[in-house]
Amino acid sequence: GDINGYHTDMRVDMVVTLHACDTATDYALYNAVLWNAKYILSVPCCQHEVNGQISSETLAPMMKYGIIKERMSALATDAVRGELLEYRGYRTNLLEFVDMTHSPKNILIRAVKANISTEKRNKALNEVKNMCDELHIEPTLYKLFTQGDKEI
């Protein structure tokens, strides 16, 4: 199935994703926020989108080597996701959920609906915007939350 465009009229308390490839994680997180889910647990998989966009003169040595660029892209993608969930009112943690020896894809995004001040939410969005500008990236979740026509 495809999470992009999936709709439900049922109440959603928790959204769980495991290795939703590339932007599928973004659509799952976006839908979780639209559904006003109380809890989100997401283990992203590959982050190809940002790897194809990222560039930085300041970080040129990191952009030169494919494996370093790939890992930086993955970390940048998940950091943006975490901050955007904060922006949308979720207390968010990014944690290692299994040891690296078992899986290199071991970051869990854990988000719980919370009462986060408008000031903190706007700060999270501004930090994401600055990071995206610096790295020349426009991740799908950022576009969905800032250019979407739905009020969340």
Where are these regions (language model features)?
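Class I S-adenosyl-L-methionine
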Residues: G1-I152
